[in-house]
């Protein structure tokens, strides 16, 4: 099966910038209280294993681990996974795709897509959300973070490197509608203005949704 171009693009770009990105992003959580607040809320609400999907260098996985979450990470980029394993040796990281997660149905209490769906074309989002739904147990939680907007931007420079990477900004109402169609119920929605114009140009959104069904009950298909 031929890999979609957007996956190849994202892997190649993040393999290229993995070390530079990790250095620049390492302390961002300390500078964005809303990030910490939402991650703290998610950590308090979730029970059972959590996978950080599109984990990058593992900074969010590491933070959740410190909050007591049973977390592991998966990323498309082998270089990012290598950085994550080095920086967070107490967390398990694997190479994988959010379109085809190596997990049984209903395996997770929670899933995290922290600025990772932003590299997936809008028309592919229903397939991604269906895969998130598949791997979550009934009542399981999904946390998403993304830039708010209705446009796609192509980056040819990033973190001091020549790259090619598309970033899709998302409309929270549209995302919630797609998540509802995939079998999720809304839980928490938060939007904020850019924290620092150096790295944020648009408002940012966080969504927590819950997979329909009672915890411990068989999934409804």
Language model segments and positions:
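A short acidic, Gly/Pro-enriched loop at the edge of an enzyme's catalytic core
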Residues: 99-111
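A short glycine-rich, Lys/Arg-flanked "PGG" loop and its adjoining helix->strand segment in the class I
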Residues: 126-138
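Short alpha-helix
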Residues: 167-182
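Short, glycine-/aromatic-enriched active-site segment of Class I SAM-dependent methyltransferases
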Residues: 148-166
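Class I SAM-dependent methyltransferase SAM/SAH-binding core
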Residues: 51-53, 57-100
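Conserved class I S-adenosyl-L-methionine
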Residues: 2-46, 150
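Conserved beta-strand signature within the Rossmann-like core of class I S-adenosyl-L-methionine
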Residues: 140-146
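Core SAM-dependent methyltransferase catalytic element
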Residues: 195-221
């Amino acid at each position: 099966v031929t890999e979609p171009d957007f996956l190849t693009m994202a892997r190649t770009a993040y393999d290229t910038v993995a070390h530079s990105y990790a250095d620049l992003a390492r302390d961002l959580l300390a500078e964005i209280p809303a990030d910490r607040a939402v991650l703290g809320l998610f950590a308090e609400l979730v029970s059972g294993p959590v996978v950080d999907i599109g984990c990058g260098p593992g900074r969010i996985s590491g933070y959740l681990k410190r909050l007591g979450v049973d977390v592991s990470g998966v990323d498309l980029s082998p270089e990012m996974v290598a950085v994550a394993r080095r920086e967070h040796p107490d967390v398990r990281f694997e190479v994988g795709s959010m379109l085809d997660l190596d997990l049984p149905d209903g395996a997770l209490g929670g899933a995290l897509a922290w600025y990772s769906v932003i590299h997936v074309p809008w028309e592919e989002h229903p397939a991604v959300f269906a895969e998130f739904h598949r791997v979550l147990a009934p009542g399981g939680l999904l946390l998403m973070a993304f830039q708010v907007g209705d446009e796609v931007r192509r980056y040819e420079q990033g973190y001091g490197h020549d790259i090619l990477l598309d970033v899709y900004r998302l409309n929270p109402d549209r995302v919630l509608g797609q998540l509802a169609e995939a079998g999720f119920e809304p839980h928490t929605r938060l939007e904020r203005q850019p924290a620092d114009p150096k790295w944020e140009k648009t408002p940012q959104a966080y969504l927590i949704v819950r997979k329909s069904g009672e915890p411990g009950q068989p999934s409804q298909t």
